[in-house]
Curated annotation (Swiss-Prot):
It catalyses: 5,10-methylenetetrahydromethanopterin + oxidized coenzyme F420-(gamma-L-Glu)(n) + 2 H(+) = 5,10-methenyl-5,6,7,8-tetrahydromethanopterin + reduced coenzyme F420-(gamma-L-Glu)(n). One of its GO terms (biological process) is one-carbon metabolic process. Pathway: One-carbon metabolism; methanogenesis from CO(2); 5,10-methylene-5,6,7,8-tetrahydromethanopterin from 5,10-methenyl-5,6,7,8-tetrahydromethanopterin (coenzyme F420 route): step 1/1. HAMAP family: MTD. Belongs to the MTD family. Catalyzes the reversible reduction of methenyl-H(4)MPT(+) to methylene-H(4)MPT. It is an enzyme of class 1 (oxidoreductase). The lineage of its organism: Archaea, Methanobacteriati, Methanobacteriota, Stenosarchaea group, Methanomicrobia. InterPro entries: MTD, MTD_sf. GO terms for molecular function: ferredoxin hydrogenase activity; methylenetetrahydromethanopterin dehydrogenase activity. This is F420-dependent methylenetetrahydromethanopterin dehydrogenase. Its EC number is 1.5.98.1. Keywords: Methanogenesis, One-carbon metabolism, Oxidoreductase.
Length: 280
């Protein structure tokens, strides 16, 4: 059986950059296939509708809706539309736990969700953010989510759903993830060196704090001479977090302790630690 996984990318968060790639890192899995439709940078209704229409036409076994601020009208409408079409749906978004009404509604719904608290909004001010700065920020954030363990935890949750479909479950029978990724559960079981763990935890906490700084710079500060240093400082924080992740990775390499968990062609996950060894 080949499991069909649909991915709707609405706007951009770092988790969306890698969502489907994490499931098939060498493009050789034979048990699943993905189809991704994107609205690009936009979250307008017509853009969202185009994405959802393409996804429904493909008829996936389940869908993933990745977006910033997953309690906004566009992402909410997308998942409701997919649900109405009988497609089980998992929401992947940044930290919406502070948005009380929308967060409570999501928790009470039948949707799965993975909240990535460190997937912090960018410093989107014209006087500061150009295409190069945007790409640099996202590169640093992807590194943080990869090397702290957040991406692995996200990938494992999605693989659990794929395994359920392979076992014959479908529709409402699927148990969808309900997970809020923080510095505790993201880093758990990811490191053999305690100093590497400490650096990764620090990196996650810094990245998570970036969102609040960028909110201040983008929405709470009026004068451009005031908000430019604020958003610039947020990007420096993300760069510092990425540097801590590099340091953590190097510590793990130094003691030959990097944990690797590749997929086999069958979708089975195997693991290894020593560099010169075979995964089992």
């Amino acid at each position: 059986m080949v499991v069909k996984v649909g991915v709707a990318k609405l706007g951009n968060i770092a988790a969306g950059v890698m969502a489907e790639l994490l499931l098939d890192e060498r493009a050789d899995r034979e048990d699943m296939m993905t189809f991704m439709a994107t609205s690009g940078t936009k979250l307008q209704k017509e853009d969202v509708d185009r994405v959802v229409s393409n996804l429904k036409a493909w008829q996936p076994d389940f869908a993933i809706v990745v977006s910033p601020n997953g309690v906004l009208e566009g992402p909410v409408g997308a998942r409701e539309d997919l649900k109405a079409a009988g497609i089980p749906t998992i929401v992947i978004t940044d930290d919406v736990t502070t948005k009380k009404e929308g967060w409570e509604a999501l928790k009470a719904s039948g949707f799965g969700y993975i909240i990535v608290k460190a997937d912090a909004m960018i410093g989107a001010r014209r006087e500061f953010l150009d295409p190069v700065e945007m790409a640099d920020y996202n590169g640093n954030l992807v590194k943080v989510l990869a090397l702290t363990g957040a991406f692995r935890k996200l990938q494992l949750e999605l693989d659990k759903v794929i395994d359920q479909v392979k076992a014959g479950k479908k529709g409402a029978e699927l148990e969808l993830p309900k997970l809020v990724l923080n510095s505790d559960n993201s880093t758990k079981g990811e490191f053999t060196n305690p100093y590497a763990l400490a650096k990764a935890r620090a990196a996650y906490e810094i990245a998570q704090a970036v969102a609040g700084v960028n909110v201040k710079g983008c929405f709470m500060t009026k004068e451009w001479t005031d908000y430019v240093p604020i958003v610039a400082s947020a990007h420096e924080m993300m760069r510092a977090a990425a540097n801590l992740c590099d340091q953590a990775r190097e510590l793990e390499k130094g003691c030959d302790g990097v944990i690797r968990k590749p997929h086999k062609k069958t979708g089975e996950i195997v693991s290894k630690v020593a560099l010169i060894s075979k995964p089992e």
